[in-house]
């Protein structure tokens, strides 16, 4: 049986990230207490992960990001202020993402090569963002090949591919940007069941997670 290679990632954000950014300072941050617990668990099982970090927290808690980095985990971008890219202007998107890259690179001293959109919010309505990302990162992990009331591009590839500039759900090997879709499980030969993400991990039966 071929060896199964799993890619683990963490969206580094807090419980209030879905609220308006202007109100974030009104809430208690929990990432300072919970992150060491997660790092200890990863260390126990010798697991390395990619942390998609909201830039706000890197700016506020740079030492915490350095601790993640020192444990051998990759630091990637999850925007600066956890914006929904479908509901934000092009100017604000470019400003927010550029700020996230700058903050993360200043904190880590390393080039950021990965990005994941909050709410998996890249779809046909704003696929131009991939062209913007090509100038900054090597891979994206925002296109969730599922049908959901909240997000998703159900006809997008389930496997790693290179998004074409003509059609973002088609593979073009000549493109350098790599798309790493969040994990799905194909059922009934016609439906992609979302598996990646904390909600699905908690809600789905164990046999689906295990497979």
Which residues does each PLM region occupy?
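Short loop/turn segments at strand-loop or loop-helix junctions that form parts
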Residues: 8-14, 78-80, 181-185
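Short acidic, glycine/proline-rich loop/turn micro-motifs
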Residues: 19-23, 86-87, 191-193
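Alpha-helix N-cap and loop-to-helix initiation/capping positions
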Residues: 23-30, 88-95, 197-199
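Short, hinge-like loop/turn segments at secondary-structure boundaries
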Residues: 25-27, 68-70, 93-96, 131-134, ...
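Aromatic/hydrophobic pocket-lining residues that form the small-molecule binding cavity
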Residues: 31-35, 61, 93, 97, ...
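Active-site-adjacent pocket scaffolds in enzyme catalytic domains
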Residues: 110, 117-211
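Active-site beta->alpha N-cap acidic-glycine motif
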Residues: 1-74, 116
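Metal-dependent polysaccharide deacetylase catalytic core of the NodB/CE4 family, i.e.
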Residues: 45-126, 138, 142-151, 175, ...
């Amino acid at each position: 049986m071929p060896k199964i290679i799993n890619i683990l990632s963490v969206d580094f954000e807090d419980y209030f990230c879905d609220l308006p950014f202007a109100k974030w300072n009104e809430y208690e941050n929990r990432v300072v207490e919970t992150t060491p617990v997660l790092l200890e668990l990863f260390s126990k099982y010798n697991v390395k992960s990619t942390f998609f970090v909201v830039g706000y927290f890197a700016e506020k808690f740079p030492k915490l990001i350095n601790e993640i980095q020192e444990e051998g985990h990759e630091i990637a971008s999850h925007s600066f202020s956890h914006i929904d890219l479908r509901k934000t202007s092009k100017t604000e998107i470019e400003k927010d993402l550029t700020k996230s890259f700058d903050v993360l690179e200043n904190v880590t001293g390393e080039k950021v090569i990965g990005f994941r959109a909050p709410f998996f919010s890249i779809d046909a309505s704003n696929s131009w963002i991939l062209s913007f990302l090509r100038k900054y990162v090597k891979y994206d992990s925002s296109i969730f090949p599922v049908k959901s009331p909240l997000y998703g591009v159900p006809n997008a590839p389930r496997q790693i591919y290179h998004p074409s500039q003509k059609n973002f759900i088609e593979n073009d090997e000549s493109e350098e940007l790599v798309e790493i879709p969040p994990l799905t499980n194909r059922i009934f030969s016609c439906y992609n069941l979302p598996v990646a993400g904390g909600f699905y991990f908690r809600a789905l039966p164990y046999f689906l997670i295990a497979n």
